[in-house]
């Protein structure tokens, strides 16, 4: 191998021939996708394109009508629940924290369900995960209702990281957040990816997130998927993709991308 040639990333997750339909409505028609080890992959598409359904399919939370998903070369449905929980972390759109549990108790929940760690060890790890997500350890005693929207997202990140997953699935991580808070979440995602090597799959309609932190983007349109770098997708002639990436809202995201890459 030439010393200047970068080693090719291998897929950590592969989906082949995915078909999802609800009743007579087909959402995905034989979609195939590789998620590469260590990348941040963004998934975008219009309303009704099945972004969240695809995310759940890739994470093993939804069984497709046809096709298969493999994680580390193993069919995802053959991986035991505990092993899958240790490999995959999921952040749902609204955080999905239990309101009756404190923040720390929410973070410890996966440890209680899937490990035999002592309570003291769970508490110590929960404090570490909260810090990793950009929260102080004393936030752990609070309840979700006492947190801002951005802090709820960070607490959900901490819980998703509880079992040291190799791949994170994030459903609209910056939705309902002001631009400054959303920027902080983007920075957190990039830091987790760069410092821990975690592979990240993000469903988002946030163009700034897509343009600034995603190595590749997968766009759902007409029941199919188109995958590539932003530069490659910008050259697409598919009508929805072209309108999405060249519309008025894309201009600000492109400016943010130039600034981000200039600072990076």
Question: What are these model-derived regions, one by one?
Answer:
Residues 44-46:
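The feature captures the beta-strand-to-loop junction immediately N-terminal to the Walker
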Residues 59:
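Helix-to-loop junction immediately C-terminal to a conserved catalytic motif
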Residues 143-147, 151:
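Conserved ABC ATPase signature
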Residues 164:
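Conserved catalytic motifs of ABC-family nucleotide-binding domains
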Residues 168-171:
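Catalytic Walker B motif of ABC-type/P-loop ATPase nucleotide-binding domains
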């Amino acid at each position: 191998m030439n010393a200047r040639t970068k080693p090719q990333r291998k897929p950590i997750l592969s989906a082949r021939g995915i078909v999802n339909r609800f009743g007579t409505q087909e959402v995905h028609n034989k979609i195939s996708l590789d998620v590469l080890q260590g990348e941040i992959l963004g998934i975008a598409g219009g309303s009704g394109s099945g972004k969240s359904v695809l995310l759940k399919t890739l994470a093993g939370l939804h069984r497709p009508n046809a096709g298969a998903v493999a994680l580390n070369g193993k069919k995802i449905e053959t991986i035991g629940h505990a092993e899958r929980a240790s490999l995959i972390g999921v952040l749902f759109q609204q955080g999905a924290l239990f309101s009756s549990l404190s923040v720390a108790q929410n973070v410890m929940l996966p440890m209680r369900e899937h490990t035999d760690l002592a309570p003291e060890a769970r508490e110590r790890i929960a404090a570490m995960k909260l810090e990793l997500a950009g929260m102080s350890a004393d936030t752990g005693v609070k309840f979700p209702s006492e947190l801002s929207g951005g802090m709820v997202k960070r607490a959900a990140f901490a819980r998703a990281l509880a079992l040291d997953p190799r791949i994170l699935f994030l459903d609209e991580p910056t939705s309902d957040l002001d631009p400054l808070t959303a920027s902080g979440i983007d920075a957190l995602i990039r830091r987790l990816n760069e410092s821990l090597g975690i592979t990240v799959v993000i469903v988002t309609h946030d163009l700034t997130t897509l343009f600034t932190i995603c190595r590749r983007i997968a766009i759902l349109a007409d029941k199919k998927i188109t995958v590539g770098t932003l530069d490659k997708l910008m050259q697409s002639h598919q009508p929805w993709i072209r309108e999405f990436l060249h519309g008025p809202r894309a201009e600000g995201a492109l400016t943010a991308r130039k600034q981000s890459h200039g600072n990076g």
